[in-house]
């Protein structure tokens, strides 16, 4: 059963796109210039995409295209992509080796919030959606991104964006509700912990 679940999760990670064609499209579309040749960015402000769920990447590209998510450069990069382009590019990055953390993942406050949340403030455990160690792996739960090992500065900026309402494209606004309840110190602790996973 565990092997079946692993195969199912691997298939869900890639989705319906073609990773071989996606590589060609990602290279032609200049994705590698910012997100790295293997989907791991060398710029701390730019997210890693290696090992990310294709469905999540497709949603983000669609949101940039529609204006549901705003970013000056990514809006331009996504504007001419077809649904097939997005699926193929998503499959390519999903098929890359999953991003690895560069920190120790030892922040106690961050770990507690990640593993347990805070019921008194209606903050669910991050792991309940993002999986153990933030690497996904929850069958059928492909719209919540892999966050373990993501860039600390990027993680912090996204949590702050959700808290302030600058980013609003999470399903049912769940990330806005969670981030609004976090203190600046908790955001810093979570970014530090998650980046080290």
Feature-to-residue mapping (PLM):
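Sequence context surrounding c-type heme c attachment/ligation sites in exported
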Residues: 23-32, 51-54, 115-127, 148-157, ...
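Axial heme c-ligation environment in periplasmic c-type cytochrome domains
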Residues: 42-48, 63-105, 140-145, 163-197
């Amino acid at each position: 059963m565990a092997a079946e679940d692993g195969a199912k999760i691997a298939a869900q990670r890639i989705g319906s796109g073609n990773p071989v064609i996606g590589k060609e499209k990602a290279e032609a579309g200049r994705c590698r210039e910012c997100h790295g040749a293997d989907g791991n960015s060398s710029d701390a402000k730019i997210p890693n995409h290696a090992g990310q769920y294709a469905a999540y990447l497709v949603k983000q590209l669609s949101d940039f295209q529609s204006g549901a998510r705003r970013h000056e450069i990514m809006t331009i990069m996504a504007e001419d992509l077809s649904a097939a382009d997005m699926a193929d590019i998503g499959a390519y990055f999903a098929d890359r080796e999953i991003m690895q953390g560069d920190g120790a993942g030892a922040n106690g406050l961050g770990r507690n919030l990640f593993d347990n949340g805070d019921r008194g403030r209606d903050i669910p455990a991050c792991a309940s959606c993002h999986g153990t160690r933030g690497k996904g792996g929850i069958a059928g739960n492909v719209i919540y991104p892999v966050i373990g090992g993501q860039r600390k500065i990027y993680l912090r900026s996204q949590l702050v964006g959700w808290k302030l309402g600058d980013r609003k494209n999470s399903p049912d606004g769940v990330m806005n509700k969670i981030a609004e309840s976090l203190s600046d110190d908790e955001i810093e602790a979570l970014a530090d912990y998650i980046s080290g996973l």
